[in-house]
From Swiss-Prot:
Region (CM1 motif): 51-94
GO BP annotations listed: brain development; centriole replication; centrosome cycle; chromosome segregation; establishment of mitotic spindle orientation; microtubule bundle formation; microtubule cytoskeleton organization; microtubule organizing center organization
Record-linked Pfam families: CC_CDK5RAP2, Cnn_1N
Entry GO terms, CC: centrosome; cytoplasm; Golgi apparatus; microtubule; microtubule plus-end; mitotic spindle pole; pericentriolar material; perinuclear region of cytoplasm
Domain of life: Eukaryota
Upper taxonomic lineage: Eukaryota, Metazoa, Chordata, Craniata, Vertebrata
Function in brief: Potential regulator of CDK5 activity via its interaction with CDK5R1. Negative regulator of centriole disengagement (licensing) which maintains centriole engagement and cohesion. Involved in regulation of mitotic spindle orientation. Plays a role in the spindle checkpoint activation by acting as a transcriptional regulator of both BUBR1 and MAD2 promoter. Together with EB1/MAPRE1, may promote microtubule polymerization, bundle formation, growth and dynamics at the plus ends. Regulates centrosomal maturation by recruitment of the gamma-tubulin ring complex (gTuRC) onto centrosomes.
Protein name: CDK5 regulatory subunit-associated protein 2
InterPro entries: CC_CDK5RAP2_MYOME, CDK5RAP2, Cnn_1N
PTM per Swiss-Prot/TrEMBL: Phosphorylated in vitro by CDK5.
Gene: CDK5RAP2
Gene Ontology molecular function: any one: calmodulin binding
Amino acid sequence: MMDSVLEEDVTLLGTLSGCSGLVPNVPDDLDGINPDARLGNGVLSNVSEETVSPTRARNMKDFENQITELKKENFNLKLRIYFLEERMQQEFHGPAEHIYKTNIELKVEVESLKRELQERERLLIRASKAVESLAEAGGSEIQRVKEDARKKVQQVEDLLTKRILLLEKDVKAAQAELEKAFAGTETEKALRLSLESKLSEMKKMHKGDLAMALVLDEKDRLIEELKLSLKSKEALIQCLKEEKSQMASPDENVSSGELRGLCAAPREEKERETEAAQMEHQKERNSFEERIQALEEDLREKEREIATEKKNSLKRDKAIQGLTMALKSKEKKVEELNSEIEKLSAAFAKAREALQKAQTQEFQGSENYEAALSGKEALLTELRSQNLTKSAENHRLRRSIKKITQELSDLQQERERLEKDLEEAHREKSRGDCTIRDLRNEVEKLRNEVNERKKAMENRYKNLLSESSKKLHNQEQVIKHLTERTNHKDMLLQKFNEKDLEVIQQNHYLMTAEDLELRSEGLITEKCPSQQSPGSKTIFSKEEKQSSDYQELIQVLKKEQDIYTHLVKSLQESDSINNLQAELNNIFALRKQLERDVLSYQNLRRTLEEQISEIRRREEESFSFYSDQTSYLSICLEENNRFQVEHFSQEELKKKVSDLIQLVKELYTDDQHLKKTIFDLSCMGFQGNGFPDRLVSTEQTEIMKDLSKGGCKNGYLRHTEPKILESDGAHTPGCLEEGVFINLLAPLFNEKATLLLESRPDLLKVVRELLLGHLCLAEQDVSGEHLGGKTEKTPKLHKKLFEQEKKLQNTMKLLQLSKRQEKVIFDQLVVTHKILRKARGNLELRPGGAHPGTCSPSRPGS
């Protein structure tokens, strides 16, 4: 059964996917069967893909390999079917009608699939052939046209070379014949010379009759030979003339035919090329037609030159004909001369007879003999003259022949030059075609690149604009939110300032003279550092960060708005890509400059902050040291000077107390004046700048805690401390430089710094100038609207910062100089404090001895 299946179905291809119920019972380890044989329809899927895409470039080898693989798989499937049938027969001994039906159906499916496969293979073969024919058609046609043109050009070149060789051979043969003719003429000259010599000898030998007879016989023989040679030369001349006439006529015909062929061949080739170019390249038609017209004009000019050369050749032929006519006339003359020679020969015969008669009649008459000799001499002279004329004519003929040969060589050279010009024109045409194709390809590539770049640039700008619009929208929302918050905080600050002013006015009315003493005591003994709590510091730092971030966001927004407005304007104006690139380069350069300026500004700010922090640290250390020293000195004075004060009299004590009261009043007035000025400056510098609600609440709580602790016995100082704190901790959210500058001036707003400033009005002026200059700088920074203006103001700001640094250094020097004065003031205050205490003790011991300058102790409620 297996043999029958193999013989019937050689290229069977089938799938058993339809009868999946039979597959699980099949063993995988059968003999002679590949376990990797697939029962799915993977092969058919590959075939279907190939039928779907018939234009795929595939060779016949690929198809043959695929067919062999299909045959192998078909064979494996047949074996598997055979073993399946045997296994089914072994397992099922009962009725097998269902199995037979399935087998028949499978065979039917296999045959149908086989037919489909054959049809698809045919389609694939046809498609591959069609693709190959289409791919090779264009190249084959171009190659065929090129080969035809090359063959025609080679044929024309071969014909021209053959004709040229034939002409050269003919010219060489004619030259050889002419040389032979010239050699014959030379021999004739030699013979004539020999005849003349012989005639001269005959004159000498007229003594002997026998010798004369022999000489006459020889002369007759020579004359006959000369006649024969003349006849042969005349025959040669006629043959040469006939050959020349024959050569001239076919040469003219050949040259005209060749020229016509040469003219017709390139015209036909050009017509074919123009037709092909019209079909393939319609746009190139104008350029090719212009070039063809130029070539046709060149060909016409060359045809005109050839026509002129033909006319010249005709003229030359006419000249040759004229020369032939002259030769004929000369031949006639030669015939006449021959007739004369015959007459002379007859005369010679008569002379012989006369000589014979003279021999017989030797002695009859010498006079007749001499007359005969004179007649012969006359004949010889005539023959000599005729020979000379013939030799001159021969020279003229040679010269004319040389001229004709030169003209023929010139014509051949001109013909070669024209052929070379034609070849060069063909080469230039081919080169021009190649260059035009290359240029077109380059132009197409450039257009594609330009279009791609334009698309990329448009997409990029669109993306940038969309992103920028989104960013602007988000940032505008943030700005609105922040402005609302700042307005709310400004309102709260204004309320807080109004409350502070009311409290200050109330405290002014509650002050009494008792508070003066307690205030002086508080100034000397107590240390009121007016330090802020860590919570307030953190809140201030957060607010500073928020304000700095807010300002940076505003600056970035302004920069981006300027950049994007400029970009939108440039895009709306629809300038060229070069302008856009130049603007982008300028923007990048400005950004780099801004980044450099920002870095330099940050470095300067860091250096200033470091210097300011060092100065603050030193000042705080110095103030703390001075306070410790004053407290220590006060203790020492209390212990050591107790006995010295007891020795004072009542009048001295009264004077010292009155002086101290006046000094304290002056200090108090100066202190109030200084605090008012500082408060005014703080209000001027920080008016309109909001604080957060948390900061206000924390400040209020801290102030209440300080009041509850009772750090200072002076009520005025209790109410003024929040203002000092306010002036210390107030930072404008406009810029970070103001915060740094106010942190630098914070130590000056402490109580100990106020005492120093009271004693030094020049320091007050310097502080005022610094504050006013810093405020002007802040206003100038805020007033900058666009990026270009800020870039121009950066060097000015650097200069102003440098000037402020110098001023700060000067103030630090002044502060260092004022340390000594502080020591003196503190010593004086300690001394006055001790004196006041002793005086108070002495007065209290006396009954009813109250001094008018003294006051009752302070109330706890104040």
